[in-house]
Amino acid sequence: EIASCLVGSEMCIRDRYCGKVLPEGGKLGLCGLTASCGLVRSLQKELDAKKGTIKLLNLEDELWTEGRPALPATPAWLLPKEYAGFSPAEKLGQLRAKLSELGCTAQLVGKLDNLAWLLNLRAMDIQCTPYAMAYCYVTPDKATLFIDTARVSAEAAAELKENGVELAEYGDVLTFLAAQAEEQTVLADPVSVNYAVYQTLQANPALTVKDEADPLLPMKGVKNEVELAHTREAHIRDGVAMVRFQIELENRLAAGEELTELTIDEILHKYRSAQDKFLTESFGTIAAYGPNAAMMHYHATEEDHAKLEKKGFLLVDSGATYMDGTTDITRTYPLGELTEDERLFYTWTLQCHIDIARAVWLDYCDGHMLDTIAREPLWRHLINYRCGTGHSVSHVGNVHEGPHALNGRNTTVFKPGMIVTDEPGVYEGGVVGIRIENELECYHKASNQYGEFLAFCPITFVPIATSPIVPGVLSRDELDWLNAYHREVFEKLAPRLTEDERDWLAKKCAAIGA
């Protein structure tokens, strides 16, 4: 008998559930192409208590024979070196050097964001994420890209060939791996390689499989100077779009127009898509009014959404991917009268945001250590947020990536060139949700007899609402940071705005006192 169960999003809950419902000596069926090796191992640990086993099967192919949509096959293209900083050949050289250090001669790259970075490969197979469904097998003298070759243009195929990359069909990857006759030590990351691929590698006697974390993750986590320069520029254009969005929002509300949470995404798309080099939203816009914002990843729908009123807060978390960078920004806008608690929550959230943004630390500090800096202003009031403070952002890719982050579990040491979001918040269920988010760039601040000091600088330039701030709460240093930030916002955005827009921005960026 094969016991089946729904796989939930929480790994530990899912694994315990499967272990609970499986009968003694039972079998759990799953598709090895859609389950990572790490997932299967985690499940097996829970099944061991009942002497249960896992059986790989693909019931979808057997049962869904009619009307099944094909896999996504959007046009695949290469991000130009002028945006990426390095060619695929140069990145392959970097990877091979790292593999040699790890005692490996080959790697199967199965994680789409790592593969995209390695080969500068982009497509639109995943909503809001410019990646192609593919695998890449890298050896000392060759790289083979498994992809639906029909969607790779002749120009892109020629460029890949020039960079030492051969094309093969996506569906041939398992056959290819099983047929490898040359002895290789293959790096396979259990977290990112699916179980069917991992088993195929293990079953080939010519291949020795070595479990290692994917070295591409830290390589792409530190942005090169070209990537940094372009993403800074992308954020300025994104800031222009955000300014125009807020102006329209304020004008339409002032005119008494009835707006809903759904209206927000429409306005944002209008202004972002008008910007040069726009590709797509980087994720589905979160526009949450009033109590809805207390649900951290709330999404309005046609069936369930709120109307905006002239009171309370509107939280807008949004972003875009351009040819030269990916953005992620949250602003919480006051729409009218606020309660004293709402104003205090907003001010304390802003303190958290500022304190991590202006932090200075020694170069051994990791995301876990820095996370406490952001939370301390809220902890003083016995408040906490049940999520991370920030996450890494890809360059022209997915809005969440690793290896670094600001949260209570991350142990990756921060390095110059890393980008991370700064997004503390207060979430009072059924009452209000507040979040303020910028992207920050880590840079080297100073060297002295005590060591190497690092710091952050913002790369998001959009005014932060100052009217909700409770007087006397922000310190002089925090006020100085906020005023300096707004001066920089105005300096960067004003030259790209109309005269009326500049006047509006000048008011939003006006210095405030204690």
What are these regions (language model features)?
Residues 78, 286-298:
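Conserved AWS/pre-SET-to-SET junction and N-terminal core of the SET lysine methyltransferase domain
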Residues 281-290, 389-393:
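Long, charged, glycine-rich C-terminal linkers/tails
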Residues 1-8, 12-13:
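Single conserved hydrophobic/aromatic residue that forms the stacking wall/gate
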Residues 14-127, 131-135, 142-144, 167, ...:
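Extended, domain-scale alpha-helical bundle/helix-rich regions
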Residues 247-279, 353-385:
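Extended boundary segments
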Residues 115-119, 394-399:
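Beta-rich nucleic-acid/ligand-interaction surfaces
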Residues 136, 231, 268, 287, ...:
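Conserved hydrophobic/aromatic pocket- or pore-lining residues that grip, position, or stack substrates
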Residues 4, 22, 122-124, 128-165, ...:
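Charged, cofactor-coupling segments
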